[in-house]
UniProtKB/Swiss-Prot annotation:
E.C. code: 3.6.1.41
Gene Ontology MF: a single term: bis(5'-nucleosyl)-tetraphosphatase (symmetrical) activity
Name under which the protein is recorded: Bis(5'-nucleosyl)-tetraphosphatase, symmetrical
Pfam family, one: Metallophos
Gene: apaH
Family in the record: Belongs to the Ap4A hydrolase family.
Enzyme class label: hydrolase
Its biological purpose: Hydrolyzes diadenosine 5',5'''-P1,P4-tetraphosphate to yield ADP.
Superkingdom of origin organism: Bacteria
Entry annotated with the keyword Hydrolase: yes
Amino acid sequence: MATYLIGDVHGCYRELRQLLNQVNFDANQDTLWLTGDLVARGPDSLEVLRFVKSLGSALKLVLGNHDLHLLGVFAKISRNKPKDKLNELLNAPDADELINWLRRQPLLQVDEEKKIVMAHAGITPQWDLATAKKCAREVEAILSSDSYPLFINSMYGDMPNNWSPELTGLPRLRFSTNAFTRMRYCFPNGQLDMICKDKPENAPAPLKPWFDLPNQLPNDYSIIFGHWASLEGKGTPENIYALDTGCCWGGVLTCLRWEDKRYFIQPSLTHLP
């Protein structure tokens, strides 16, 4: 009964299956954690969704910003960009079933026994674990409701970028969505910077990667995240694991087996026949 954590798949179905074969993943006894961004950019978003949905209770995933963008495209709110390669998925006979399943997935996974917290972009230093759970539930509730297109329509935007318990309504939901799915850098006070996407060594002062600021989670918890491919899985504190290693850009798909902290990789096949 092993726990496998894999970074952003981005439609790289062949790589995902080969990586799972490499570790002898067994859905009847193992658990697969995915850091979000299942879809877009890679060639096989449809097959990725069909496969991960079929895993049932063996799967623990979180939504990423590209997954949310797919919901927007499906609801005819966001633009379908050719570079995202979503047409096959959107035109599939089971598109409604798959996308409605996707929008009912969480933004945050917490395993209190294994002391694991997973979110696509990470956990903002301005939140403790209870606040993160509460904010995730709020966004999940609106995404899984029939009124989710109204939220998607108001989701885009960089403000507010500073957490306050007094935030309400759409501004509160937008902050939470940005923190869970888009965050990279923070100011020293924990305020989000939604502009800089450079590698940490090129980021302007006083910005710091969110994981380099003190967080409010219990000391014995580990944070798993994806989203930030240019990190190449490096440069994080000991108990924070960056698993997006840019498979869809020609990098590798990375898997961490939790029990022995062993890494496995599958090089990108995206540009191969």
